[in-house]
Amino acid sequence: MKRLYTLLSIALLALPALACTNLLISKGASKDGSVMVSYAADSHTRYGTLVFMPRATYPKGEMLEIREWGPGRYLGQIPQAEKTYNVIGNMNEHQVLIGESTWGGREEFTDSTAILDYGSLIYICLQRAKTAREAIEIFTSLADEYGYASSGESISFADPNEVWFMDIIGKKPKFNKKGKNVNKGAVWVAIRIPDGYISAHANCARITTFPKNAPENCLYAKDVISHAKECGLYEGDGSDFSFADT
């Protein structure tokens, strides 16, 4: 349907190694001008799963319990939004859609004190965002505030007008004498898929070099390059910095 986009939820049988695949199609690349994103999670534990979260309102001060997506491990609590949107599967009532694929990354960047894993962030964003850009902002700001409890991820964000692709990984923790991580959060880069193009990702970081002054088409963590330098992973002026190769 024109200007509406389609979610193609593909559940595949378990393979020897878990894998996810996302296919992203911009408006100009589809016959009827629809944005389309497919998300395949090759996991027997999620086969046939279709999440439903009804629209709701909450009293001020309500807290949201966070449990890791999949294992169900309790991670902590964050303030609940006063208003949330309907969510079915990986899409909400405003046709904001989020998919993912996991690529792991550096073990030393794991924050054992973090509260928000990627799965929880996906569904929190779907409950709160009206656009793909807003979902990116919510995802990254919450990760910075409460800590990112997952490994490296590629995330698809879409709405009826735009499709975005983001690579993200947690920052290397720095614990003070009280055991508090003073360097929580994540570093990330998000690229808008140009209209008329398609893209895909499957368990591999894909964003290499990226434009630094094009906010309509590229968003990124302000410390993505400086963090790599601090960790001894990059030397340079930033012009040749590649997220995926670092």
Where are these regions (language model features)?
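N-terminal start-of-chain detector that recognizes signal peptides
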Residues: 10, 69-71, 127-129
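N-terminal signal peptide c-region/cleavage motif recognized by signal peptidases
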Residues: 14-16
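A contiguous strand-loop segment
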Residues: 20-118, 138-246
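Second-shell loop/turn segments in exported
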Residues: 110-112, 120-129
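Generic detector of short alpha-helix boundary/capping microenvironments
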Residues: 7-8, 83, 123
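Sec-dependent signal peptide recognition
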Residues: 2-10
